[in-house]
Amino acid sequence: MKYQNIIDNMTLKEKAAFLSGKSEWQTRDFPRLDIPAIFCSDGPNGVRKQAGAGDHLGINPAVPATCFPTAAAMANSWDEELEQRVGVALGEESMEEDVNVLLGPGLNIKRNPLCGRNFEYFSEDPYLSGKMAAAFIRGVQSTGAAACAKHFAVNSQELRRMAMNAVVDERTLREIYLTGFEIAIKEGGAKTVMSSYNEVNGVYANENEHLLKDILRDEWGFEGSVITDWGASNDHSLGVKNGSTLEMPTPGLDAARELLASVESGKISEKDIDERVDELLDLVLTTTENAKHYKKVADKKALHEEHHKLARLACENSAVLLKNEDGILPVGAKVQAAVIGDFAFDPRYQGAGSSMVNSTKVDSIKDMLETSGISVTGIVRGYQRDGKEDEAMKKEAVDLARRSDVVLFFFGLNEKSETEGLDRKHLRIPQNQINLIQELAKANANMIGIISAGSVIEMPWHHHFKALLHTALMGQAGAGAVLDILSGKVNPSGKLAETYIKKYEDTPSYNYYPSQERNSEYREGIYVGYRYFDTAGVPVNYPFGYGLSYTTFEYDNLQVKPDGATFTLRNTGKYDGAEIAQLYVGLPGAKVFRPVKELKGFLKVFLKAGEEKTVTIKFDDKTFRYWNMKTNKWEVEGGVYSIMIGASCADIRLQDSLAIIGTTEVMPYYTNRVSSYVEGKIQQVGNEEYETILGHSIPDGSWSGELGMNDALCQMYYAKSGIARFICKKLGEKLKKSEAAGIPDLNTLFQYNMPFRAIAKMTGGMVSMEMVEGLLKVVNGHFSGLGKVISGFFRNQKLNKQYEKDLEEQK
């Protein structure tokens, strides 16, 4: 071990206490051993360091920081170099604020568009997610801070996220949900990984030996620290034994006592603890040493201004032009434009929850119009942000549209639509916005829509627009970038990192999401996003990888060799611009079922008008592989592969073939037993087929019997105790009230969906697991549990004081 000399000088009590947090954001320090505390902070798109009382939900204010476009937007740039620059800026702001570990990026695969936190994640594709995450991590860690890849793994719904079991087959786990993390670890060099709240195949992620030990540490060679999501620890001892390093936030010393008892009983060994202590020491001592050598800026305001410019550049490169009929964009200087939409006054530029940033400043369309070069007839809100109809506002907007040449309509999802802790109920934008679109289109045929939405929306109204610019959640400097695109100063170059479907019912996981019981069944398998839509022939509004430009690009001269594909790319239009060339690979007639094509490489290429470049996209170890569940290893199926170069997954410009020698000797499936998967008819997968790819029977996910430690508080609806049912009812009423007000109550949402054990994990040591056991007895109708709660309280206080005293005496 790297720090054996320090470990030898630590008592077992010190080592046990070291492996859980000291406070909401800090690790425990030991001055006598020169072990300082380090500070963690949320920050996938901006540093959220709370100056006062800490919370993990973004409720209390944080110090000012630059709010960059969210991961959903950055992924649309397909620009690894730009993502790395953003990572550097986030790392710099972390170091300026004495943040040692930045809790990002988020690599969750966008399995289903209803997930309330999709704005925080990159893509439906693991390869793109992994490449962008690796760039982010390299940038952050180049400054001396540590990045934290999250949430590991298979975490795709907010509903009961702490009490949900993801039932997923090994092939899908490897190919879809872990590949991005593999790239982030191997190519990005992430120093920390955050374990997710949920169970994976019946074992909580934070204590899952298969995930943490077999794959993360043994296969990928990860030597860093695994940090729990806040309150995600279930069995702290098993977590430590199986590869989890640090439990956060502070569970008090109950967690430390749990480790001591487990060593005494033989459940774990002191060696298990020493290994985790060594990992955490490396993180603590390395990042604090880096902080000593980091030279802080003399003028933080100047640094923030520099980063504001970078945030604007990031938006410029990630906005996606979905539609541009009649070349209506860019807007000419003499064209009189009506600017309509509440988002033009107050931009919707970030999501809610733990990633919410206290921005250094926020640009708005309204404030920047004067210098935009766009001639404006007027600017009005047009609709109420909370979704309420307002006829006076609508009439004002329609009148303005009628006397203008074009309409610039700013719209999309409001704040309550996208937030941590709450999944969306549908994919529609607010109805009052749809009604206004219809009225505006009657008044003016030249409609240009600017969409702010961190995740997929249905677009039954898109035919009303001649042009659509999708900005996702564009960060604090997005307004200037958008106006530069609309006026033609900037040529849009973003492409979609997720498929924009026609209707939610087309989603492959539609029948299984979100899970209303304990199990979340991933029956769709590897057919996530475009992998399904392409294979099943389901029409979509805008496909994965799609995005227009003000110029045009020509692909030619494809040459495929064993190590990659080379082709020429020419800008045939009048504007300078960037094209994102995409490499897809498929195997016609494959014996092992697979999507018709999968992304295996990409490159963003800038070309001046008329310029031509030779482009090469290399193959790598992931180009032809699949996971064989029978041999339990990566294999290659032999055959003649289609090598496709496209402007999107639906726009293949060049194609050739390449014969590959396979490694498969044992087939993973009998084709006749998985016909729905072979044909891509995922929404009709039956139990027998699902069990075939799982390799075992479907576990029982129904709720029954008395409530236990890992049942969510919302399940008190079924409790025997009338008091418990009353509390559950009140929590539900509180949520409905906040929803009606348009302001999600994140704290209540967290409580509603958290399991009983989290009461001990999230109360800073005030509540012990013994007390929760007593509380559960009460909930289950046994009022004798009240005595256990009371006696447990006093026992917990006494034991905590004694433990603190023992630690103090070591000083």
Where are the language model's segments positioned?
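Long, charged, low-complexity terminal extensions
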Residues: 702-759
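C-terminal non-catalytic accessory extensions
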Residues: 739-811
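Charged, amphipathic alpha-helical linkers/stalks
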Residues: 649, 655-726
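Generic surface-pattern signal
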Residues: 8, 12, 24, 264, ...
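Terminal connector regions
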Residues: 621-668
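Glycoside hydrolase catalytic-domain context in secreted enzymes
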Residues: 1-622, 626, 640-644, 649, ...
